[in-house]
């Protein structure tokens, strides 16, 4: 029989503020992560053509500096997203470069090994970072495990390179990538600015929780210990993916920016019809109709790999059909309400 005198206090998630912010500095780092990494090129809306143009534009000096610094560890650049915000101003690439030049080399390498992540903000965490930077092999492995900031090999590479050389290479890579690839291919500054401006009026009437869901198209975030602010940053180059990183007490969520094109079908309409035009995604929706599920549960029920499901879930989320709940564990579920396909199509072709 249950003990009727036993009570358990469950604390509510801590409050947080949500803020919209854009800048080409964010977009450049996200593009650099794509250029650096080895994820499937066709998983991005920009497609293989973007990668082909970027590779053709990049100099051998850029490629050499990049490989020396981070190898093919694309997500390593996410750890500098907070530095764009910290730099202030227009949050553009030049401001980021100026901020890095004015930073101590120790601060730059600390950020790149994950030292600004909340998991390492404690006294124990900072001691671990210090030991790793001093060259202790076990500390580097423990740092990678605790921060989840990539494999320990990537952290060891940075530590062996040294703080001053890491800073020099970081400046060279970001500067060259900006001049050779990012700017010539188009920074999308106007579209990014328009996305934030378009959401600003609605944002004033929303709670922080509502703004996160509204901006990201289906991410539910209730808050967590150590996070007091959520920075919502639009991105075009990484569509349909959402990038999530942390910087001290700030969670940074880079969501897909809207990019309407006059004369062409509404992008949201295209995404909805594309999402529904696949048997696997329809099975996913039916499974989620029964309740929220973790990725591992979906993989087991549908008999698919997690990597395959990630792609399908990204398409469904981009279409606004499902939501992702962030917390102790990530869960996927259906968003309230379903799109009226007849109305969407009728609006486009001009028939009531």
Language-model features, listed with the residues they occupy:
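Helix N-cap / beta->alpha transition motif
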Residues: 104, 254-256, 334
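Extended mid-to-C-terminal alpha-helical interaction segments
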Residues: 209-211, 215, 220-324, 328, ...
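N-terminal, charged low-complexity regulatory/assembly segments
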Residues: 1-223
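Minor-groove-contacting beta-hairpin "wing" of winged helix-turn-helix DNA-binding domains
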Residues: 328-335
